């Protein structure tokens, strides 16, 4: 390789993993969770706010926001109920509960660090088995509670306590702008 007279620039070293990752470069796994429609709309608004303003550290996408909210919530549960240690992983063939809600829930797809996804499943199983965490009976309910708490804090800090609004404009009949060309 030809030299241009300048010394090579070393690649940056990322020594601190992002919130939710056990280590830099950890593998991720696809995950889907169902959350209430109104929470999904707040999530969309928060992601838009974060990407437009840059005021929410480490949040550039829906996956980032879900990952950070889940990490904070699960870490708090581990501190409160398991001396800061991760909860045991549920059996590999364990399946979550079916839907037990009456309002419209929306499925969201994200990619989570493998270790965080396992911690979410372990915490959800603990919460369901012990009834020590009110309202958390499944991974979906855990993610819902984590997002609601995290978004409420963001709304207090960045939006004068008002809920974030879904940035997609609604047309008559509930259609979105994009749907009129589909």
Regions found by a protein language model. Give the residues of each.
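A detector of short terminal or domain-flanking linear segments
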Residues: 1-182
């Amino acid at each position: 390789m030809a030299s241009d007279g300048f010394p090579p620039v070393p690649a940056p070293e990322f020594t601190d993993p992002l919130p939710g990752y056990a280590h830099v470069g950890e593998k991720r796994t696809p995950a889907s969770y169902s959350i209430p429609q109104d929470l999904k709309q707040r999530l969309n608004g928060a992601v838009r706010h974060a990407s437009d303003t840059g005021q929410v550290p480490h949040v550039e996408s829906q996956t980032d926001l879900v990952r950070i909210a889940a990490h904070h919530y699960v870490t708090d549960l581990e501190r409160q109920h398991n001396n800061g240690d991760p909860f045991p992983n549920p059996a590999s063939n364990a399946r979550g509960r079916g839907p037990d809600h009456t309002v419209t829930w929306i499925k969201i797809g994200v990619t989570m660090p493998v270790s965080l996804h396992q911690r979410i499943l372990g915490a959800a199983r603990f919460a369901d088995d012990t009834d020590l965490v009110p309202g958390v009976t499944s991974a979906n309910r855990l993610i819902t509670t984590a997002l609601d708490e995290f978004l409420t804090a963001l709304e207090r800090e960045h939006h004068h306590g008002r809920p974030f609004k879904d940035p997609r404009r609604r047309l008559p009949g509930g259609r979105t702008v994009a749907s009129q060309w589909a």
